[in-house]
């Protein structure tokens, strides 16, 4: 599971399910840059989802052009419950918590059963302060491989 923290959206209707549509969001560009892979023509993450990755924001909606506009409106209750349920009922998950808002969710996770990776948010404003070079994707695959679980083709 990847918790992107609070998302801002620059355009209306540019996110569908757990994926961005249209031109990649700046955060998606930063993620692919860190992976050393070419930036895709869209921000669609269906390929990751089909391998078991669950990208989720702490707050699932936002008013266009208003960063964090739906914070403290109830989404956190739902997303916290999702994180707790996954932590309690599954084993050997990798939680990537990006940004201070997402990092605060670590208390919901049983860290003895799961790998928890934290760093700054992958936004263009903060990625250079710890996201680049954090190696979360290779660390996740190392953990999965060590548990006999198929790696993710990021």
Task: Name each model feature, range by range.
Residues 1-97, 101-104, 109-118, 122-127, ...:
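A polyanion-binding, active-site-adjacent surface
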